Amino acid sequence: MSMTASSSTPRPTPKYDDALILNLSSAAKIERIVDKVKSLSRERFAPEDFSFQWFRSISRVERTTDNNPSAATTAAATTTVHSSASSSAAAAASSEAGGTRVPCVDRWPFFPFRALLVTGTAGAGKTSSIQVLAANLDCVITGTTVIAAQNLSAILNRTRSAQVKTIYRVFGFVSKHVPLADSAVSHETLERYRVCEPHEETTIQRLQINDLLAYWPVIADIVDKCLNMWERKAASASAAAAAAACEDLSELCESNIIVIDECGLMLRYMLQVVVFFYYFYNALGDTRLYRERRVPCIICVGSPTQTEALESRYDHYTQNKSVRKGVDVLSALIQNEVLINYCDIADNWVMFIHNKRCTDLDFGDLLKYMEFGIPLKEEHVAYVDRFVRPPSSIRNPSYAAEMTRLFLSHVEVQAYFKRLHEQIRLSERHRLFDLPVYCVVNNRAYQELCELADPLGDSPQPVELWFRQNLARIINYSQFVDHNLSSEITKEALRPAADVVATNNSSVQAHGGGGSVIGSTGGNDETAFFQDDDTTTAPDSRETLLTLRITYIKGSSVGVNSKVRACVIGYQGTVERFVDILQKDTFIERTPCEQAAYAYSLVSGLLFSAMYYFYVSPYTTEEMLRELARVELPDVSSLCAAAAATAAAPAWSGGENPINNHVDADSSQGGQSVPVSQRMEHGQEETHDIPCLSNHHDDSDAITDAELMDHTSLYADPFFLKYVKPPSLALLSFEETVHMYTTFRDIFLKRYQLMQRLTGGRFATLPLVTYNRRNVVFKANCQISSQTGSFVGMLSHVSPAQTYTLEGYTSDNVLSLPSDRHRIHPEVVQRGLSRLVLRDALGFLFVLDVNVSRFVESAQGKSLHVCTTVDYGLTSRTAMTIAKSQGLSLEKVAVDFGDHPKNLKMSHIYVAMSRVTDPEHLMMNVNPLRLPYEKNTAITPYICRALKDKRTTLIF
């Protein structure tokens, strides 16, 4: 059969999608992974491997003045802890005396484990194996990055209460451990406890001890915290109750099968850290897994050639942070002979071959060569030439603005944003807006930090200078270094939080009422600002407020750095897209089942607000209005009864009928109801006004909506005459909510079909903007404002795995978002906190909650809560570094490798090119394969050997 089709014969449309065929072809072998994991997870450790409560004697306290480890042993009070009282006393004594908890490596048992290696090209189906494991086995699913974890949550369709976490969160890592892990002094101190030099790690026992020592400061802190909690529980209850409480400490107690995605970004020693904490938590809780002597089975998923793990060290004295490449888990399992033999990698390696993200054969063949380090052919290099475009075009923000720019460094990203902002200021200034970023510094903690970091210093460094130098550590580096930040930092003193609260309380008592500034249940919860953890600021401490401003672009492509709480309040898109969502129940289907009632209520509110569009569209004629009036409107008891009461209500002399012009019951939940007579002053603005929701009666001579309806029934929408605004979910049963939704949906679809028929299909292409039970005003400075002063919607979250469009910001109260005031200084709250508004791929609008983060610094073994930042948790998808794009699928990509790139690596080239889903939408400033680049040749022989090994499981 000839493979050349006739030019006159049209190519038949394939019955099945290429990606589906590729996934089906690999399904059988993917199922074998389940059998392999089952076999590995059946391993048991021997009863004599662990002594009773071994975890209580793995460390001791050494005073900082002691230089001799053996001498310190006799001075320590916690070699073996026999009671909760002695443990607490020792911990307190060590803290006061500047003691450091050091390991007793001679008392450490060996922690056995099993490992399965799952690698492959980008988009080859590694995630499919995780889906199969999650569906068939009881396992703990994690990722090394937030993006990887949230991507798995979306793929596995996890509910909001069961989101996939990062492996660091699973074993107990929190923000205050960042400086502990980075401390150069701690790592230098622990060098003396190593059992051997790296080249002498000839046994798995030696390797495990040295790897755990590399992370010991964090391990010791987590262990101390858990032991103190266990001892407090044991003192107040039985040992069994204490064990049961500890069993809920970590997901590592749920299963001995632990899946870690994107392991190529995790340093080698983290594998042993995960193994250690599996045994620690299960031994502490005396769980079923520990009683059955289950050995942990770690499934390491990722690509060793497209990622690299970095390790950093921070010096408090010089305030310098050094970053260098480390050995990642995947490379260690592939190259380290000790791990290869112990884990039997030859028999426990699954390799995915073909790229399913992009099904172009030539492009997939190129990626395969790059992934496995096979020498490239000349035709591969020539093939990449087709993607080259002039550098000036790629660096011009106005050229191919829909494409995501990828750069090697943050400096290049920042330069691109500056060019973009300058260009927008000239042509589309209305798209730019800036918002404040707050940093509340505790003066006492900062002073103590300066004294610990530089005891001989004459005076502490100015706090604003310290903030500028440590901005990358205080606030997420990738999030902020790419944005256009103001060069000026405003510094001002804050009143003590207790004084602000007292003033507010006296004001409330004088004027009456409570109220919440940023939404939720109201009341005065500022006092909770003092109630946090062991590093919380004292109520009487003085604080300094540092403020800088960050510039955003309306309509730009953005993402978030972590799962962020948000509220769905509206929809913005085309009428056709909205109808498609209704017909397929797309929004309902993607909502977790426990939130189903809220989803039905939200879409009902959107439908109610969207009904006005049929009467105000540019295509609406009198003939269409007559046809629309004939559409059947079924009775909905919960809405029609209220409508009847409205019609029967007497006229009010004040011109404001409390039924027609009521304040929404939802809007009073914040404690500050908006009077109907209160006017809103707007400059240049666009108003989406739904007549039945309008509260405006500014001109006494103007004809009101009600009067207009009295004069002509043709322009009176019978929908709004029959139904009142849907009440809140608390007033309806689930059945009533679903009935209301189906009724509104059917009416909307019938009206849509009628308009499509009468307009010849043109109505579907019109833009549609609808908000949940609200009238909305778009101001010239990108501010979105509700005419009631508040928004109401469904509580949800936005994911780092998704891309969103920035629509602006709002300063209005968001009633569905719980208050975060207890974490923010009350004086900052009084200034008002703006929230960003994002639109997802379907068109739904989210109000993003503010991001509040506490920066805890560790110096000389002491943790200090130095500052709290309030920002927006946003990262740009318009432009980013190649490293930041790891794990993302992008539709259109423009890569700028620079004019004379230094330290260019094959991993950079591979990650940048493999992000795109279609090579037709890829462009680069140069052909990087024609430039000198660092090849990952060290690991290539091992991969080639595995490809030829019959024991390796290959999945095409």
UniProtKB/Swiss-Prot annotation:
It is an enzyme of class 3 (hydrolase). Gene3D superfamilies: P-loop containing nucleotide triphosphate hydrolases (3.40.50.300). Keywords: ATP-binding, DNA replication, Helicase, Host nucleus, Hydrolase, Nucleotide-binding. It is found in: Host nucleus. Its EC number is 3.6.4.-. Residues 667-678 have a biased composition (Low complexity). Its main location: host cell. Component of the helicase/primase complex. Unwinds the DNA at the replication forks and generates single-stranded DNA for both leading and lagging strand synthesis. The primase synthesizes short RNA primers on the lagging strand that the polymerase elongates using dNTPs. Possesses helicase-like motifs and therefore may act as the helicase subunit of the complex. Belongs to the herpesviridae helicase family. This is DNA replication helicase. It comes from Human cytomegalovirus (strain AD169) (HHV-5).
